[in-house]
């Protein structure tokens, strides 16, 4: 590597293997004169769609069942059943023939913007069965697709023409049910819009903790917060495990309530729900606003 003085920049030539693009990630480690590691950078090589495709295949398959009652549509395959509300288009329940029901429900709801339910329809796409709801307002549609292998796919579209601190969708899931989480993405630390450095792309796993700034006992890294560039995340709960994967790049996941200040309400308020999948997150300085000044540039 070249000799680079402090505050200067330069180029490093990396002698990579001819087939390096076939790998999932690229790691670069900087070592000091004493031979000790200074830092390791990591970059995703394959796109998110290619990475997600490697975890989707499941050997067992059954025909997809679509059943309708007075309240819900139910989509079932390979022992997995999803219940979709006929009045809202939202997920209202998840069931598994081999374990207890999951309390992951009431989504996707917009964390910012308006949505007014218009209609819902059912359909088929090859071996898959579909429930699709349309909306007026900022949310355009929600489409649920059940595959024969039991994977439930969610597609949605929204458009917000406003200055908002965060954008995306949320679900409900009780924080008290969580045991641990495992994910492929940046970690192990949480991030903010203006604090994106200091995390490394890898597969991470950590036990649930409720560490908050200024309140002991401290158990770091914090379990709750905004996490960046997530490809998949596995929730390990008292009800069992479930996995959420995406082929979208640059997805943020928000885990639960992580504001540690009491008294005045922080700004901005956390997104609705307990677990969020976001395209934008707020800056850290805004959490000190307390309704007085919400300018992150002033507050830090």
Q: What are these regions, as identified by a protein language model?
A:
Residues 19, 50-300:
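Beta-strand/loop-rich accessory regions of lumenal/periplasmic or secreted enzymes
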